[in-house]
């Protein structure tokens, strides 16, 4: 039986098989990501302690320089051996699901794990969440290859692994599912969402077993409801965050050019750019150790400290600049949590300014930390649903959902008006442009929904790329074989046979 025949049979597979596979992915990916998260947390604690001691013991600074350089060299060799461990990892997962990238799961898994732990532990302002998504996806890919699944089934497991990775990193299972649908897979498929949700829930259970049941960013006191008469402030905040988000994306997509210039000056190959980054971070570690790392501890501290406008502004500037420097190095590490941290600081700056103007009182400042995270991330990622649910799950307070929704929507609209792209899609385009072109013509099956733009049209009237065959249309649990005179029905699911390297092109045509 060839792969296409297997896909035809598995399209009607009972959902309990999807649940079973989701459990398998959730347990394994949850364990891998939870260990990754635990090691990073321990490494970050040690790093902060050493920096605090070094301020009073200059000899320790020499030790920090030595260790940082050794770690940077080790990570550089890991990157040289496997380029797909660079950066966040989310664009790599998206590229694989589109049939554009085909990395070795084991080669990426262990190198991303080790490189991420080393890089983030020295204090670089990188997030664990992007790598966690890639680690979850590669763990799931390994399971799929072990189970000898078809290419289509493998993609479902990879998507579920990505959801499980985010869930275990943030204890946010619903956001894990939404992120896969909104940012990675781009549409609902029954087998995808059942497998992904199961994997997310199981991975979250594994993570909760290790880290406890409090939300990742649980606030120390209950947040008050924001008065309706002041909602105009939320609109201003959304505009502010949208503009900042656009600026962030513009720079983060170009920071690599800065390192290319430095690389020419210091005669460094790209995999050793991190040698400069680990030196850049030392002054921040000595004088602002609480600003190091991904930023979750800083977000919690903002809630308790209520920093003045000048302090919050200084923190925002430092985090913005050094987050860019950290990510531009190409070290394994993401921008997911750093984006949330910049959003929290932006919200804090905004709230402090409006308090000085007399529009807010101090009890409302913590609300703006939450709103800043949701709006900033929603703008940069252009995944507003994920932003809203993620922040709500992380904070553990459903009462703020209305205000979060307003700010996230406005920030998203501003970002769209300014012409900003979803940051991970933009990174994927850059990645593909600098990767060897796919020339293979491996047939595989994909499923896509019939959208409003296609509903009511005849199949023979569609302009399809070469090698694309629409085989089946399923509507209200009724299956029909597709031919030229078949009329597409809104809400139906189409099963198509395409060349694997054309998945992205076909999805754009249908979605």
Predicted features along the sequence, with ranges:
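Alpha-helical transmembrane segments and immediately membrane-proximal extracytoplasmic
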Residues: 1-436, 441-442, 475-477, 491, ...
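A generic structural signal for short beta-strands and their flanking turns/coil linkers
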Residues: 444-446, 466
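Short, surface-exposed ligand-recognition loops at beta-strand->loop->(often short) alpha-helix junctions
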Residues: 447-454
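Cytosolic Rossmann-like ligand/nucleotide-binding regulatory domains
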Residues: 454-506, 510
């Amino acid at each position: 039986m060839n792969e296409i025949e297997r896909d035809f049979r598995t399209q009607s597979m009972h959902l309990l098989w999807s649940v079973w596979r989701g459990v398998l992915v959730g347990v394994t990916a949850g364990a891998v990501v939870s260990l990754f998260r635990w090691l990073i947390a321990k490494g970050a604690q040690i790093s902060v302690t050493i920096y605090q001691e070094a301020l009073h013991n200059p000899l320790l600074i020499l030790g920090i320089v030595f260790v940082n350089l050794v770690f940077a060299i080790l990570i550089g060799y890991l990157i040289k051996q496997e380029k797909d461990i660079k950066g966040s990892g989310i664009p790599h997962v998206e590229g694989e699901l589109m049939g554009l990238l085909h990395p070795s799961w084991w080669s990426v898994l262990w190198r991303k794990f080790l490189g991420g732990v080393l890089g983030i532990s020295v204090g670089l302002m990188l997030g664990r969440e992007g790598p966690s998504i890639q680690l979850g996806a590669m763990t799931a890919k390994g399971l799929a290859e072990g189970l000898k699944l078809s290419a289509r089934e493998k993609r479902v497991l990879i998507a579920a692994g990505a959801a499980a990775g985010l869930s275990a990193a943030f204890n946010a299972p619903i956001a894990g599912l939404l992120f896969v649908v909104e940012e990675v897979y781009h549409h609902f498929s029954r087998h995808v969402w059942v497998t992904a949700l199961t994997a997310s829930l199981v991975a979250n259970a594994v993570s909760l077993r290790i880290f406890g049941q409090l939300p990742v960013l649980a606030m120390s006191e209950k947040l008050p409801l924001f008065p309706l008469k002041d909602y105009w402030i939320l609109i201003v905040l959304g505009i502010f965050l949208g503009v900042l988000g656009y600026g962030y994306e513009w720079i983060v997509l170009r920071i690599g050019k800065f390192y290319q210039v430095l690389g020419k000056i210091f005669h460094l190959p790209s995999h050793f750019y991190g040698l400069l980054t680990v030196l850049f971070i030392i002054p921040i570690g000595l004088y602002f150790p609480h600003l190091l790392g991904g930023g979750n501890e800083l977000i919690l501290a903002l809630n308790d400290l209520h920093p003045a406008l000048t302090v919050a502004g200084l923190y925002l500037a430092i985090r913005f600049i050094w987050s860019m420097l950290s990510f531009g190095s190409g070290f394994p590490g993401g921008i997911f949590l750093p984006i949330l941290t910049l959003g929290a600081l932006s919200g804090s700056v905004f709230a402090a300014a409006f308090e000085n103007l007399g529009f807010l009182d101090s009890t409302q400042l913590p609300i703006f930390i939450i709103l800043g995270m949701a709006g900033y991330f929603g703008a940069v990622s252009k995944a507003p649903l994920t932003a809203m649910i993620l922040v709500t799950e992380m904070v553990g307070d459903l009462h703020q959902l209305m205000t979060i929704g307003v700010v996230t929507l406005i920030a998203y609209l501003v970002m769209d008006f300014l012409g900003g792209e979803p940051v991970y899609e933009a990174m994927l385009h850059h990645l593909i442009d600098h990767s060897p072109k796919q020339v293979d013509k491996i047939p595989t099956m994909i499923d896509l929904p019939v959208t409003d733009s296609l509903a009511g049209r005849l199949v023979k009237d569609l302009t399809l790329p070469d090698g694309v065959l629409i085989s089946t249309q399923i509507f209200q649990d009724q299956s029909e074989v597709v031919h030229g005179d078949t009329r597409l029905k809104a809400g139906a699911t189409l099963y198509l046979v395409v060349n694997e390297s054309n998945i992205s092109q076909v999805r754009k045509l249908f979605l």
